[in-house]
Design a protein with these regions (language model features):
Chain B
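Transmembrane helix boundary and interhelical loop/hinge segments in multi-pass membrane proteins
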Residues: 70-90
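Aromatic- and glycine-rich beta-strand/loop motifs that create alpha-glucan
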Residues: 1-28
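Membrane-interfacial helix-loop-helix connectors in multipass membrane proteins
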Residues: 45-56, 120-141, 186-202, 225-227
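A structural motif at transmembrane helix-loop-helix junctions in multipass membrane proteins
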Residues: 134, 139-173, 223-228
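Hydrophobic alpha-helical transmembrane segments that constitute the membrane-spanning cores
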Residues: 101-126, 146, 150, 183-184
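Hydrophobic alpha-helical transmembrane segments of multi-pass membrane transport/permease proteins
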Residues: 25-47, 63-65, 171, 175-182, ...
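Junction motif at the cytosolic side of a transmembrane helix
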Residues: 211-228
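Long, hydrophobic alpha-helical segments
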Residues: 57-73, 77
Length: 211, 228
């Protein structure tokens, strides 16, 4: 591990560990994530994948070890808005349509110039369902209604917890396409998965979690 | 990276909560009906004697409105916690306390405002003299947001626990005592033709304090609730 790269890694964890009531959940864990890099977080159920992502998002506090963001000690305010977290709970309001949910997210997080919301919803595969209340959508469509934030919100680091769950084959390809596009423009992503998915086609970086 | 404008974020959140409340307008009607029924029970229980009802009218309306607000209180953050919206809100590049203040405002508009609208009706049923009516409305306009703000802190503190409804009531009602004393004091002073400005000013002062501090306390409490 080189200590002084020309550009510091976007995210760096050193001996990161987490305990719940003195029971180790995971760690110690060392990894680096540079801009343009996509990594797959692997591990069995209960190995702490979700916990790791929640720590990196800033929802849980770092118990042990060190976390650095763009070369500096991790601070909640420094990364707010630069990180997009998509957890098990999708953060969608069932009584609002996909379009309205997206408008709220864009209001809070800001949005990219391209694409527009209508275009983003079409590309994510919700054409014709934009104005349907989200609670009437299928599980896969709900997932897409949450994933559409990836297209619109301007975050550098994506933390995606099981983004492939409930998605069909075209949905999985869609997520892979989004990840590839994100990496190409200098974004980074951590993606958890417990199952075998055709992740980005090639051989991705892997972060292995041990309980 | 430039952060999205604060005003747009506030507007988006306020609009979202108001639209959500409107799509479930049956829930808005519930506390109103509850207050209507409770206020109707008093003449039945105490007899329709005008002098008695007149004397208790202000206090009955205040307590009824307070209890009706309590019914809707524990739903303030529950939906957002269950569907993950709160996580998205906490991680948004916006001051969390201000965002929560918007949520509390939306909650006040959808639960307390309808109650204030029917308060003259309730007070009229109990023969409150017309001269005291503006003071009652003023006291309610100051007391209800105060209760929303105090309630929001407790809702945030009990957010991690299940079945927090009863616990919430037990924690909030003692805090309501000074609010009720000042609000009812103002109304009864107005009824007796005495100066009523002092208790109303106290309510206003407490509201100003809560407006600043309660959202901050809510933000801290909800961060802790998520960090568990």
């Amino acid at each position: 591990m080189t200590a002084s790269p020309a550009r510091p890694a976007l995210l760096e964890a050193r001996a990161l560990a987490f305990y719940r009531q003195d029971e180790p959940v995971f760690g110690p864990l060392d990894f680096q994530l540079a801009e343009g890099e996509i990594a797959l977080v692997e591990g069995d159920n209960g190995s702490g994948k979700t916990t790791l992502l929640r720590i990196l998002a800033g929802l849980l506090h770092v118990e042990e070890g060190e976390l650095r963001w763009r070369g500096e000690a991790w601070q909640r305010d420094a990364q707010l808005g630069d990180v997009l977290f998509l957890g098990h709970h999708l953060g969608l309001k069932g009584d609002l349509s996909a379009r309205e949910n997206l408008a709220v997210a864009a209001g809070l997080y800001g949005r990219r110039d391209e694409p527009g919301p209508a275009d983003a919803l079409r590309r994510i595969g919700l054409a014709g369902y934009e104005d349907e209340p989200v609670r009437r959508l299928s599980a896969g469509q709900k997932k897409r209604a949450a994933l559409v934030r990836l297209l619109l919100l301007p975050a550098t680091l994506w933390l995606l917890d099981e983004p492939y769950a409930n998605l069909d084959r075209t949905g999985i390809e869609l997520v892979n396409g989004l990840l590839a596009q994100h990496a190409a423009r200098g974004g980074a992503a951590l993606v958890t998965s417990h199952g075998a998915v055709s992740f980005l086609g090639g051989e991705p970086r892997r972060i292995r979690m041990h309980a | 990276m430039s952060r999205p404008p604060l005003a747009a974020a506030c507007a988006a959140l306020l609009r979202r909560d108001l639209v959500l409340a409107w799509r479930r307008r049956g829930d808005i009607a519930m506390p109103v009906l509850y207050a209507l029924i409770v206020a109707t029970l008093f003449p039945f229980a105490l007899g329709p004697e005008e002098a008695l009802l007149q004397r208790i009218a202000g206090g009955v309306v205040l307590v009824t409105v307070l209890l009706a607000m309590l019914l809707a209180l524990d739903a303030m953050f529950r939906g957002d916690i269950e569907d993950g919206s709160l996580e998205q809100l906490v991680l948004a590049p916006q001051p969390l306390a201000l965002m929560l203040a918007m949520k509390i405002l939306a909650h006040w508009i959808t639960t307390a405002l309808p109650l204030i609208v029917i308060a003259p009706l309730l007070a009229g049923m109990l023969h409150l003299p017309g001269a005291a009516m503006p003071v009652l409305l003023l006291a309610l306009l100051l007391a209800t947001p105060l209760l929303s703000l105090l309630g929001a802190i407790l809702v945030a503190l009990t957010a991690g626990t299940r079945r927090s409804g009863m616990l919430l009531a037990l924690m909030l009602l003692p805090l309501c005592v000074p609010v009720v004393i000042f609000a009812a004091g103002a109304v009864s002073a107005a009824q007796q033709g005495l100066p009523w400005l002092a208790p109303v000013a106290w309510l206003g002062a407490a509201l100003a304090l809560a407006l600043v501090l309660a959202p901050l306390a809510c933000a801290a409490a909800l961060r802790i609730a998520l960090d568990a």
